[in-house]
C-alpha cells in the first residue's frame, strides 16, 4: 500500500511540475519540467532525509552526549525488531518530533530540545515509539519525498510569477493567466500533500507505537502536553511542506480534524489511546521502561534532577527541570520573522 501510494504521489507531483512548466514555457517548458521532475524524484529518494534534517539544523547524537535519550531509542528499537536508526536533536522550543529516511535500514528519528525539556522519560518513550512505528510502516519514505517535492513545486510557482507570461499566441504566450494559475499551484500542492498522506497513518502509528513501548497512556500524556504547549515553530512556518512529518502539526491555526488538515484532532487521538489502554489492560508484559537516573545524580537528559510527581496518566514524574544535551545553536533559526512593522 505504501509503495503504491508513493508511486501515485510521485506521479501527481510530476504532473503538477509539468503543468507549471507548460504555463511558463509551452511544450518546451513542459519537457524541461519533466526532466527536472525526474531528477528531483531521484534526488528526493536518496537525499530528502538529509535535506529535512538540514532544514531544522538537526544534529546527530550518540551514547556519549545524549546517553538517556539514545538508550530510550535503542530500547524501543529492540522492542520493535527494527534496525537502529540515527538519532538527532534539533534546537526548537516547541515540543515535537519526526522520523525520516527512505527505509528502516536508512532511517533517522529527531526530537526537539523543547520535547526533551517538557516531557518525562516515559512520555519521550511514547513519542519515539510513535516515530519508530512510522519507520516500520515505511511512512517515512512518503513523508520525506512529499516534503521535498512540495517545496520544489512552490518554488516553481514563484518562478512562474516572476518569469512567466511571455509566450506568444502561437503556443508561446499565455499572458498573465499562466503565471496566475501557477501561483495557485503552491497552495494546491500543499493540499495534495495533506490529502496524499492519509491521516489514518497517524492513528496506525499511535497504535503501533503504544504496542512498541507497551503503555498507550505514555503517548496520550505526551500528546496532551505537546498540544497544550502553544510554542511557535518558525522553522516549520518557513518550511510548511514538512508539517505532516511531525507527531503534532507544528503550524499554527490548524486544530480541527478538517478534510485537509495534516493531522487528526489531538483529542481524538488521545481518546483512541485511552480506549487502547483499556483493551491492553493498561500495560503489556513486554513494556519498555526507560532507565531513570538516580535522584542525587544528573537528570535523564544531562544535568538536574527530576521533580517527582505523578500525573493523572499514570506517568511517573512530572515535567522536569532537566537540561538537554548541548547540540550547538546555529543562529536564531526559530526567531519570529522580521516584518516591516518590527
Curated annotation (Swiss-Prot):
Pfam families: Peptidase_M48. This is Protease HtpX homolog. Its cofactor is Zn(2+). GO terms for molecular function: metalloendopeptidase activity; zinc ion binding. Keywords: Cell inner membrane, Cell membrane, Hydrolase, Membrane, Metal-binding, Metalloprotease, Protease, Transmembrane, Transmembrane helix, Zinc. HAMAP family: Pept_M48_protease_HtpX. It is a multi-pass membrane protein. Belongs to the peptidase M48B family. It comes from Allorhizobium ampelinum (strain ATCC BAA-846 / DSM 112012 / S4). GO terms for cellular component: plasma membrane. GO terms for biological process: proteolysis. It is found in: Cell inner membrane. Zn(2+) binds at residues 130, 134, 202. Binds 1 zinc ion per subunit. Residues 290-342 are annotated as: Disordered. Its EC number is 3.4.24.-. The active site is at 131. Its main location: membrane. The chain crosses the membrane at residues 6-26, 28-48, 145-165, 173-193.
Amino acid at each position: 500500500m505504501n509503495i503504491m501510494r508513493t508511486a501515485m504521489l510521485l506521479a501527481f507531483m510530476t504532473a503538477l511540475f509539468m503543468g507549471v512548466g507548460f504555463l511558463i514555457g509551452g511544450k518546451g517548458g513542459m519537457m524541461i519540467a519533466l526532466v527536472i521532475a525526474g531528477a528531483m524524484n531521484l534526488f528526493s529518494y536518496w537525499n530528502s532525509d538529509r535535506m529535512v534534517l538540514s532544514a531544522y539544523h538537526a544534529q546527530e547524537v550518540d551514547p556519549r552526549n545524549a546517553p538517556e535519550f539514545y538508550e530510550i531509542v535503542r530500547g524501543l528499537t529492540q522492542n520493535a525488531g527494527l534496525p537502529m536508526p540515527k538519532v538527532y536533536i534539533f534546537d526548537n522550543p516547541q515540543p515535537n518530533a519526526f522520523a525520516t529516511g527512505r527505509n528502516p535500514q536508512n532511517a533517522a528519528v529527531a526530537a526537539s530540545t523543547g520535547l526533551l525539556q517538557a516531557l518525562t522519560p516515559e512520555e519521550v518513550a511514547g513519542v519515539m515509539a510513535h516515530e519508530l512505528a512510522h519507520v516500520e510502516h515505511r511512512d517515512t519514505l512518503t513523508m520525506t519525498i512529499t516534503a521535498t517535492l512540495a517545496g520544489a513545486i512552490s518554488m516553481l510557482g514563484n518562478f512562474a510569477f516572476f518569469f512567466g507570461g511571455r509566450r506568444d499566441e502561437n503556443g508561446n504566450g499565455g499572458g498573465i493567466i499562466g503565471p496566475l494559475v501557477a501561483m495557485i499551484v503552491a497552495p494546491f500542492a500543499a493540499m495534495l500533500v495533506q490529502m496524499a498522506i492519509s491521516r489514518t497513518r497517524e492513528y496506525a502509528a499511535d497504535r503501533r507505537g503504544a504496542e512498541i513501548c507497551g503503555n498507550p497512556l505514555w503517548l496520550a500524556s505526551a500528546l496532551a502536553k505537546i498540544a497544550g504547549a502553544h510554542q511557535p515553530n518558525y522553522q516549520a512556518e518557513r518550511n510548511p511542506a514538512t508539517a505532516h512529518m511531525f507527531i503534532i502539526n507544528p503550524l499554527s491555526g490548524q486544530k480541527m480534524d478538517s478534510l485537509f488538515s495534516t493531522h487528526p484532532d489531538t483529542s481524538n487521538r488521545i481518546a483512541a489511546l485511552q480506549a487502547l489502554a483499556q483493551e491492553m489492560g493498561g500495560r503489556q508484559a513486554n513494556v519498555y521502561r526507560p532507565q531513570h537516573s538516580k535522584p542525587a545524580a544528573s537528570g535523564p537528559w544531562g544535568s538536574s534532577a527530576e521533580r517527582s510527581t505523578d500525573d493523572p496518566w499514570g506517568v511517573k514524574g512530572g515535567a522536569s527541570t532537566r537540561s538537554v544535551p548541548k547540540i550547538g545553536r546555529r543562529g536564531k533559526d526559530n526567531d519570529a520573522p522580521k516584518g516591516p512593522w518590527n
